[in-house]
Amino acid sequence: MKPILKIAFIALILVTLFITLVYGYKNWGKPTSSTESINPSEAIHSVSGYAKETILLTPNLEHNFRANNFLIPLKSYGLELSAGNIASKITLDIPLPITIEKFNQKYLYSYISQESGSHIVRYAGKEIKGSEYLDFHDYVLHKDGTFTFMEYVPDLKDRSIHLGLKRVNSLGGVLWSWDSRGHITKEHFVKFSNSLNETNAINEKLPLSEILIQIRKKYSDFVLNVLGVDIYKRLVDIKLHLSNKTYRLFDRYINSVDHIHANSIQYLDNEKYILVSARHLDALFIIEVSTGQIVWSLGGPYSTFTKNRVIGDPRGGFSHQHDAVIYKNRLYLFDNANMFSDLPSRAVVYTFDIKNPNNSRFLFEYLEPYKRRRLSMASVQPLDDDRILIGWGGVPLGPDRQKTSVGASIVNMKNNTTEWQLDFKPGWTSYRARGY
């Protein structure tokens, strides 16, 4: 660390300690809150209809580059509903998972270590070695017991966050990797000014809690030695805001452009290809595993990454999508609709042709039941040929946060009916829904 950064960092620590003593004294002896006291069913406003599957509602996703302008009440645990709509908290061997998936009736989950600030992934209770830049949006568990993870890789030279893909064994040994550099440039970034934009404006005010979390990830040993865990926990509750310029001293990745923001991956054709959903490109693309080349792409109307478009979609395509899935020659995705200011979010289905993306044709859409835009997160999962499970994702700050919101739906495409729906109470949300 450069001398000027050391001085600035120590000064910040001294200031925060002073503020803690002055303003935090009244609460110094009070216990911190615990998710163990939370009843998961308190999040649920209503459940209607019947689901044959067990439904997993995952926690909300957080990562290094996410702005703090969306609700995150489910970040500490997930909900699971049995076929009888009985809600239960998922029991894991850690208190604060931030993502949960389920493979072979076993949970794969991730969290941030309170000791080191590192991103950690566990499957069936065992830690899986990832990488320094591990991203939590999606994983693949292969039949041979290996894993494919996504990475958000910062590049200080061009101030960009690039996409990395790695297939590893349980010990972290790299079996295959791919890097977006050389394939994708940040000039194709489709920026939505009011979205969960990972590039912070220069005048943005950031809460001290966010700053300290970032500092701890970069300088964890120093922070722990100077502050100690207990004092650190007190500091994150202080409502102090510092400017972006101050924040930049302690996070070298601030103001880097997250121009891809991949949020789902799926292997295709016996693992010859990988389908990637790239939210900030308003596009999907397919990588040929053997060559690393992008061999297929499809974009929404605002995408400059590709000229390939869907046929027959009343919107002309999708925007800032999540969770692209191929199932029986159909392409399913969640259209967050960030760039469509007057249209609600939706689940949408197209035909799929791996030889020619321009043959993709609109088949079906299901609009957000309350006609709202859900600007972040969300998921789509085909349960069979006719039924889709939709997780509706984030609720932005504003009037909508004061209302009940739909959390998940099961829709029958054949007759365009809702078979099952769960609504959250105001302020609750989930990253995605999965049926098993």
Q: Whereabouts are the PLM-identified features?
A:
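Histidine-/acidic-rich catalytic cores in large beta-rich domains
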Residues: F18-Y436
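N-terminal Sec-pathway targeting helices
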Residues: M1-L14
